[in-house]
Amino acid sequence: MNNIRKGDEVIVLTGRDKKRRGTVLARVDADHVLVEGVNVVKKHVKANPMANNPGGIVEKTMPIHVSNVALFNPATGKGDRVGVQEVDGRKVRVFRSNGAVVGAKA
């Protein structure tokens, strides 16, 4: 069971975007995620008339390693570690600090 999934709200722990919050857009592979508004770089794109691409400088969200983000716990207002517990015969993710189920409405 993955600790961080698409749609989760995370907080960045290290790097240029430290303490910035965002939503996970995609899981690139087992170790990297795309986070909305985090690790945005400017890429120079060559024009391609066949694909109707004018080219120029484009802002693109780049992947960030999962070890550099933590799931945001709204109860504490901080990043938190995640554990797995069995509730009603199903495995669910829970915050380690307070035991609340991840994604449950308060």
UniProtKB/Swiss-Prot annotation:
**Signal sequence span per UniProt?**
none
Identify the Pfam families for this entry: ribosomal_L24
Q: Which InterPro entries does this one have?
A: Rib_uL2_dom2, Ribosomal_uL24, Ribosomal_uL24_CS, Ribosomal_uL24_KOW, Translation_prot_SH3-like_sf
Q: Where are the transmembrane segments?
A: none
What is a single molecular function from GO for this protein?
rRNA binding
Which UniProt key words apply to this protein? Ribonucleoprotein, Ribosomal protein, RNA-binding, rRNA-binding
Q: Which domain of life is it from?
A: Bacteria
Q: Name one GO cellular component term.
A: ribosome
Biological role: One of two assembly initiator proteins, it binds directly to the 5'-end of the 23S rRNA, where it nucleates assembly of the 50S subunit. One of the proteins that surrounds the polypeptide exit tunnel on the outside of the subunit.
What interactions and quaternary structure are annotated?
Part of the 50S ribosomal subunit.
What is the name listed in the Swiss-Prot or TrEMBL entry for this protein?
Large ribosomal subunit protein uL24
Q: Which species does the entry assign this protein to?
A: Bordetella pertussis (strain Tohama I / ATCC BAA-589 / NCTC 13251)
